[in-house]
């Protein structure tokens, strides 16, 4: 991961985020250019400037945590004590809990878009001012998407720390439980990301970019505003090309239900590991 041209949008991003880290809410000093960083969320374009809709403000500590996930494949196993491993797993579980909440909120917002935009169209037909409603909806969507994706990236980084633990210092039962916890947490991350991707399809079905929420032009596969490639909607269309929103919403709900089930399993397995660490 490199900073590339993220600097181009720093001022706008910091102003939008009230000069505070969107993960831990640490406030930066306006006079200190190193107090805050910009971090890209989602599948940003590989070349050119990253649009501010896909940039989140983070503090240096959170930026370093996020960097761990990208550096993890090259990292050496980390030796930790039973107490340190317990705290690490507990913190990872806490962070994932926050990610679940953020993803659920984003999914709820996304599934409300057809109704919201339909109401805007009705208001416009009646001669009422609808531009402010669209702007507010767009801002809420972008914020919700960034929050969900950032939370998932932070959870991924925490999970990489768990995976990087050198298990040879622990007995076989702890090693087995640790592996099971990491595997279950990874499954949870995949399910949550699936829910986000399916939620991102909703605005595309409404001819809006899933990143910046600006209108998509014609049959273009790439947004002319932020450069993101549009999500594929073919699987969510009926025989005559109409959008099958109910089926799409049902799939989003299925992903969230799956995440809930996996969370229950993860909680049980984490408690087992915690008990073993306490006894060791």
Spans of features found by a protein language model:
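Charged, amphipathic alpha-helical linkers/stalks
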Residues: 70-157
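Peripheral, non-cofactor segments flanking catalytic/redox cores
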Residues: 96-99, 103-120, 205, 214, ...
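A broadly conserved sequence feature marking short terminus-proximal activation segments
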Residues: 1-3, 13-27, 149-203, 253-260
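Cys/His-rich short segments
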Residues: 196-240
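Charge-dense, extended regions
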Residues: 225-280
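Histidine-centered nuclease catalytic patch
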Residues: 2-10, 20-70, 207-214, 226-231
